[in-house]
C-alpha cells in the first residue's frame, strides 16, 4: 500500500483547506493501517518501516489501539525485541505515555514465561512518590543502583532511590535480559499497575549537574 505524502506534493498547499484536511486524514489512516497490517501479518520488516513512518506524527495512540488483541508469531516478537534493545528509549520518548507503551509491548514483545521474580530499579524520588515507576527493571541490584546514582536520577527533584519489588508473573511483560543481554542490564519490562509492593532500599540526595560532575570526577581519581 502506497502512503500518500502530502508534504512532498507541492500543489498541496494551494488546495482548499477542506481538501488539505481530507488528504492529511487519508495519510494518517494509511500510516496506522500499514502498522496494523504489518503486526497482523507478523511481518517484521514492514513493521519496522511503519514504526519509522509513525515517528513525529502523533498517531501512536491510534496505532496501539489498532493492534489490541493481536497475537503475532514468536519469530516476529523476537525481531521486535532485537529492535527494542536498540531503539526502545527513543520509542518511549516518542509515545510519551508509559501505559500505552505497556499495551504496545504486550503485543509486540516475546511473552514472559517465568514466575514471580525479585527485581530492582533506580528511579527518581519524584516517581517513587507518585508510583509512576518506569517500565525497565533489572534482576541486578548493582545495575539498578548505578542508575539510581546516575546523573538523570540524582539531578531530578528530590534526588533518587533504589527500589525493590517482588514482581508477580502477570506484572512482567517481557524479559529482554533473558533473551538478549548484550548490554548487561538484565532487563525486565514491568507493568507497574500490577506490582503489589515496592520498597526503598536506598535514598540518594538531589544534586545539581555541577555537583554530580565534581563527585564523579573525584571518585574517578580514587
Model segments located where?
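Conserved NAD+-utilizing ADP-ribose enzyme module
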Residues: 1-117, 125-135, 141-222
Amino acid at each position: 500500500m502506497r502512503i500518500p505524502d502530502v508534504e512532498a506534493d507541492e500543489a498541496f498547499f494551494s488546495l482548499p483547506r477542506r481538501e488539505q484536511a481530507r488528504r492529511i486524514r487519508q495519510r494518517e489512516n494509511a500510516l496506522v493501517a500499514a502498522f496494523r497490517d504489518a503486526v497482523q501479518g507478523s511481518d517484521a520488516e514492514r513493521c519496522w518501516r511503519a514504526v519509522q513512518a509513525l515517528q513525529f506524527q502523533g498517531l501512536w495512540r491510534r496505532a496501539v489501539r489498532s493492534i489490541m488483541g493481536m497475537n503475532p508469531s514468536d519469530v516476529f516478537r523476537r525481531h521486535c525485541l532485537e529492535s527494542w534493545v536498540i531503539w526502545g528509549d527513543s520509542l518511549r520518548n516518542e509515545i510519551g505515555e508509559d501505559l500505552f507503551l505497556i499495551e504496545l509491548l504486550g503485543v509486540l514483545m516475546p511473552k514472559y514465561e517465568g514466575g514471580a521474580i525479585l527485581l530492582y530499579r533506580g528511579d527518581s524520588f519524584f516517581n517513587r512518590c507518585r508510583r509512576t515507576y518506569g517500565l525497565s527493571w533489572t534482576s541486578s541490584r548493582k545495575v539498578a543502583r548505578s542508575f539510581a546514582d546516575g546523573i538523570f536520577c540524582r539531578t531530578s527533584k528530590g534526588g533518587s532511590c533504589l527500589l525493590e519489588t517482588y514482581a508477580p508473573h502477570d506484572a512482567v511483560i517481557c524479559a529482554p535480559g533473558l533473551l538478549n543481554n548484550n548490554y548487561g542490564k538484565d532487563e525486565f519490562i514491568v507493568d507497574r499497575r500490577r506490582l503489589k509492593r515496592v520498597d526503598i532500599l536506598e535514598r540518594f540526595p538531589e544534586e545539581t549537574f555541577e555537583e554530580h560532575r565534581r563527585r564523579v570526577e573525584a571518585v574517578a581519581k580514587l
